[in-house]
Design a protein with these regions (language model features):
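N-terminal membrane topogenic signal
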Residues: 4-18
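Structural signature of hydrophobic alpha-helical transmembrane segments
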Residues: 15, 37-49
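Short, hydrophobic transmembrane alpha-helix segments
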Residues: 27-40, 59-60
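Canonical alpha-helical transmembrane segments
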Residues: 49-63
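Cytoplasmic-side transmembrane-helix entry/capping segments in multi-pass membrane proteins
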Residues: 65-77
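Pore-domain transmembrane helices of cation channels
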Residues: 94-132
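Membrane-proximal soluble regions of multi-pass membrane proteins
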Residues: 128-183
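Pore domain of cation channels
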Residues: 161-217
């Protein structure tokens, strides 16, 4: 998180697009045992939603309309729902103990990474109305902030604005620490989503550790 970002410099499209493509690529590699539908469904839907967003804002996120906002948020919801369905199936496989140990641990790692990417997108879309709205001074200083970053409390970084990688970091630390670290959730919806993510991450990690111990022993 760099303090040199200004409110006037709009966020770059590339990090978000790459994260989405990584998520879609991971879903293609998942075994059928942890999928509710064919492996190509989510990648195809994801690409269909991503293409118009890239065409609309190819380099930086400078424009936003009602339809682009809905498409962008729908993409985040698609990846999150698909990921959580996969988490449920992965937990079932881990509890069943029937699948190959190494393969199921690799699957759990793929699901874990996908969870971080998906929830990072949700936080990114949710906070202060999304990436475009956050560049508007009146929305940034409103009382509707879902997250408070440490840079906001430092007068030296008054013009700093978060980008997707900051929210990705929030999602990652929530999966590892099972609680907020340097960035605090400020609204009920942000707290509930983070609590849900942390709970799912805790269950998944506990089962993975248990399965790994069984394999070693």
């Amino acid at each position: 998180m760099t303090p040199t970002r200004t409110r006037h410099r709009h966020e770059h499209r590339a990090p978000v697009a790459i994260a989405v493509l990584v998520n879609l690529g991971l879903s293609l590699l998942l075994p059928s045992e942890v999928l509710f539908f064919p492996s190509w469904v989510v990648p195809v839907l994801g690409v269909l939603l991503l293409i118009p967003l890239v065409v609309f804002n190819p380099r930086r996120l400078t424009r936003e309309t009602t339809w682009s906002r809905w498409v962008s948020f729908s993409l985040a919801i698609l990846l999150t729902v698909a990921n959580q369905l996969t988490v449920v199936r992965t937990i079932e496989v881990l509890l069943g103990g029937q699948a190959d140990g190494g393969a199921v641990l690799l699957t759990a790692l793929q699901v874990w990474v996908s969870t971080i990417i998906a929830f990072g997108l949700v936080y990114w879309e949710l906070d202060r109305g999304g990436p475009v709205a956050r560049r508007r001074p009146e929305l940034w200083t409103s009382d509707e902030a879902d997250f408070q970053f440490p840079q906001e409390t430092d007068p030296k970084t008054a013009t700093w604005r978060p980008v997707y990688l900051d929210y990705l970091y929030v999602a990652m630390t929530n999966m590892v620490a099972f609680s907020p670290t340097d960035t605090m959730p400020m609204t009920v919806r942000a707290k509930m989503i983070m609590a849900y993510q942390a709970l799912g991450g805790f269950i998944l990690l506990a089962l993975v550790i248990s399965r790994a111990v069984n394999i070693i022993s």
